[in-house]
Amino acid sequence: GIAPTGPRKARPDDGLRAVFANAYPVAYLRALGLAAEGEPEFEVGRRRVRAAATTVAYEAGGGAFRTWADAREGRGLTHDITGGRARARGADVPVRAPAEAADLLLALAREHDLAVFEFFETDEAGHARSMERALEALARLDAFLRRLVAGLGPEDGLVVASDHGNVEDLSLRNHTRAPVPVLGFGRAAGRVEAVK
């Protein structure tokens, strides 16, 4: 697990605010050793729970994690964008269209200097070697990104990146060494050209 560091200490020179927009189950956060308010929605069981790199990085910065309660109140998004997967497993979260979820992320981002959202349904589809899951996840992501890009204001930037490949080759269960795109929109458009 990750060792909680407590509240973030303000640095006199930064004054910037970041948000990790993913809303997690309380049980998952507690299994990682992170503080989370509310009752756990389910038992994690005996399986080993590992934190993603994004989770580790955000925790290291002292950020407060969002829970499914935040997703219910429109202050966070489930990892599948819409909430449909969590709802299908019995979670009390709303199901939103990708465009509505994008609007929520845009609103949340405008309250912060940096907003991060992690979508890993394509990774799970790749590990499962499921073309059906891959196509559905990519269609949902496409609708979400189209709305995000359309909703960018003149001072907004959006960077879309992946940490590795795998959904592009469903003959493998593992990550690939294929080049991954880094896309920039709005103010970020000219800043990602040099990324190789």
Where are these regions (language model features)?
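Basic/polar, cationic surfaces and motifs that engage anionic cell-wall
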Residues: 149, 169-171
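A long, amphipathic alpha-helix that forms part
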Residues: 103, 115, 123-158
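Substrate-binding rim/cap in mid-to-C-terminal beta-strand-loop elements of soluble/periplasmic
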Residues: 174-196
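His/Asp/Glu-rich, glycine-adjacent segments
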Residues: 1-113, 119-125
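C-terminal catalytic subdomain
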Residues: 155, 161, 194
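Active-site metal-binding loops of divalent metal-dependent hydrolases
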Residues: 163-167
